Each structure stands twice: as structure tokens, then as C-alpha cells.
A protein has these predicted regions:
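Hydrophobic, membrane-embedded alpha-helices of multi-pass small-molecule transporters
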Residues: 21-32, 65-83, 148-169, 183-192, ...
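Membrane-spanning helices that line or support transport/gating and their immediate boundary helices
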Residues: 43, 47, 109-121, 205, ...
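N-terminal alpha-helical transmembrane segments of multi-pass membrane transport
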Residues: 1-80, 91-96, 108, 230
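Membrane-interface loop-to-helix entry segments
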Residues: 24-48, 170-176, 183-191, 195-231
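Helix-loop-helix module between adjacent transmembrane segments
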Residues: 31-33, 104-129, 135-199
Length: 239
């Protein structure tokens, strides 16, 4: 385990400790932003209509509505990195870190736009009639690099088990144990069973649950941030 941790530390220093990695991420976003004519601004109205549910029609193709697809994507994006990561960035880099997060977010929108477009272009319908897609499909079909698609899939499975689940479940179990004396094992088993019930229902059940939970989570998230800003209003302008 110690050797594995040392490998992860080495890999992290290679990726996050070097200039080329953020330059590659931001550079990709800048390239597609210019190439596609600033789609994050050009299609802002359409994006707002999707969020508002204007395109949620039962006769539309696909297994989920656009709003359900959005909330499902957000359920996997908003979490440890967006909450703890932002706090760590501000603590480490100061208030100026917020500005650079805004910049990367603006160009990151275009990168996400391209990713989703490719996922739709190369998605396939499997035997049971359900739709399957994602980076592994457009890597294999678009780039004709099957081995990279397989490697990507394996790494994503490891990520889903590791950083995708363990830190969140561990933090919840720790809080429940510290504040309410609930055994960690009980919390883990309860959450595991709850997630199993949702996941076993496929993408439609996942999307249905996400579309109901994520808006509430968003309200709590922004409400908490607003309360913090109000309580520390004297530091807003100096920051």
C-alpha cells in the first residue's frame, strides 16, 4: 500500500506540479473556443432553455430528457473537487485563485461542449435498445485507437471506485459517527444499498433521481455560499 501511495504521489506531482498539464487543458479550451466561435456565449440562451425544461418532450429520442442528462452530469461533477478543491485553492493561492478558476471555467465550457458533441455523434444502440456512449466510443471509432479506449475504461473504473466513491462515503460515515455516534459500517452499508437500488435501475432511474436531488443540492450549495459571504461581508471588497 505504501508503494502504491508513493506512485500516486509521484503521478500527482508529474501532472499537477508541471506547467504543461494546465497549459494543455486551458490551451485545448482556448483552441475550441476560437475555432467554434465562442459557443459558451453564442448558445447561452439555448442552454438556459434546456435548464428550464423547454426541450423536455416525451416523444424526443433518447433515454433521458435534456434536463435529466444535465443533472446526471452535474451529479458526477459537483462534489469533492468543486467544494473542497475550491476551498483548498483559495487557501493556497489566495483570493486571486477565484479569478483563474473563472477563466478556466469559461474555456472549460467549450471543452465539455466538444466532449458531449462527440459522445452524441459516436453513441451506439445496443441489443436491448438502450443507448451507450462516452469517450471510450469516440476514442475507438473516431480516433481508431481501441487500446486507448480500453485503457481509458479501465482507468475510469478505478477512478469510480477510488476518488469517485471512497472519499465521499468516508466523509459521510465520519460525520455520522462523530456527530451522531452512528457506526461507520452501518452508514457504509446503508449508502451502498441505497446506491445499488438506484444504479440497478439503469440510466433512466439514475437520471430520474438526479433530476430531483441535484436542484435541491444546488440551492443548498449556493445558499450556503451566500450565507458565508453575508457573514463575512467586510472581507468581500478587500478580497
Amino acid at each position: 500500500m505504501e508503494q502504491f501511495n508513493n506512485f500516486l504521489i509521484l503521478l500527482d506531482s508529474f501532472l499537477s506540479g508541471s506547467w504543461w498539464f494546465p497549459a494543455l487543458l486551458i490551451g485545448t479550451g482556448i483552441f475550441f473556443t476560437v475555432y467554434l466561435g465562442f459557443p459558451q456565449f453564442k448558445y447561452f440562451t439555448s442552454a438556459w432553455k434546456i435548464v428550464s425544461g423547454n426541450y423536455d418532450k416525451s416523444e424526443s429520442s433518447g433515454e433521458t430528457t435534456p434536463f435529466q442528462a444535465l443533472t446526471t452530469a452535474m451529479s458526477g461533477a459537483v462534489g469533492t473537487g468543486n467544494i473542497g478543491g475550491v476551498a483548498l485553492a483559495i487557501w493556497t493561492g489566495g483570493p486571486a485563485a477565484i479569478f483563474w478558476m473563472w477563466i478556466t471555467a469559461i474555456f472549460g465550457m467549450t471543452t465539455k461542449f466538444v466532449e458531449v458533441t462527440l459522445a452524441h455523434k459516436y453513441r451506439t444502440t445496443i441489443e436491448d435498445g438502450s443507448i451507450s456512449g462516452g469517450p471510450m466510443y469516440y476514442i475507438e471509432q473516431g480516433l481508431n485507437m481501441k487500446w486507448v479506449a480500453i485503457l481509458f475504461s479501465l482507468l475510469m473504473m478505478i477512478t469510480a471506485i477510488g476518488s469517485g466513491n471512497m472519499p465521499q462515503i468516508n466523509n459521510i460515515a465520519l460525520v455520522m459517527n462523530t456527530e451522531f455516534a452512528v457506526p461507520k459500517l452501518f452508514t457504509g452499508l446503508f449508502l451502498g444499498g441505497l446506491l445499488w437500488i438506484i444504479i440497478i435501475g439503469g440510466i433512466q432511474r439514475i437520471a430520474s433521481v438526479a433530476s430531483k436531488i441535484i436542484p435541491i443540492m444546488g440551492i443548498i450549495y449556493f445558499g450556503g455560499a451566500l450565507i458565508i459571504l453575508i457573514e463575512n461581508h467586510q472581507n468581500v471588497i478587500p478580497s
